Amino acid sequence: MSRKLKKMLLCLLLIAALCVVYELWLAPYLAVLNGEPVQDSTQAEVSEVPGITVQARGDAGNGGTEGKEAAEPQISVTQKELGMDDNKITYFEIDIQVSDATDLKAALAHDKYGQNISDTMSDIAGEHNAALAVNGDFYGYRSDGIVIRNGVLYRDVPTDRECLVLYRDGTMDTVRENTTSGQALLDAGAWNVLSFGPVLVEDGKAREGLKEAYKVDGLNVSISGPEPRTAIGYLGPNHFLILVVDGRQTGYSRGMDFEELAKVFVEHGCTLAYNQDGGGSVTLYQDGEIVNSPCPVVSNEL
């Protein structure tokens, strides 16, 4: 299945010797709420869909790199299901391990930084020989915030938002922007900074208040209810878990709310997790194909 969604794009790339790529791209959030779930799917049994697991490239396990070339990134993608009928949720778990955090690189649509720059997911992924691609953040719709890509500071206008920081040493953290600056984060070793939210998990526990209304700048509705989602969790240095959740498709997947999303990260042992751009733009691209089922949108043009 292959669909091209023409969106504003930001790519976060995981590049190795064989151009294995984990790519995050920027797209607008299309806020359409699904209504109340039929039941609490967090109590339902999770089933793994046969034939959808894709094992990582390279040798299994972390392994040391001393005396040999750095190991290739380890990537696995597994499709899972929760609930049934109108309460069914379909989502994908992407487990990523790298030997060098600076292999996580950012790529911009048409290789240009700015607002209202658009391209297709497939084109950007193809230009960068991407093996894997998911949503990123919301930077192109803002004139404020901290934007760091590949160790380059593009914007340093801190706000009250909590941003996600991926450091050169392979660690991940969140920080409220108005307590720091882009230059301070850069000096501390920040490699890439994403700004969306909210924080889902901290210190290995789901953050309190995730049921409360959460609004993104420029949107007049809460995005806390069941929606298509993209989020990243931290398992340890250079080890991350990405969740891609389909939604707005009754009988296939209604999406997840923030509490449900946080619960999955906690169950996998993530000490920190952060919500990225979601909604109508949620897409999982792998090896030239869109492997999830992006929800129908009125138009793919911006």
Where are the predicted features?
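Alpha/propeptide regions of enzymes that mature by internal proteolysis
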Residues: A131-N135, Y274, V282
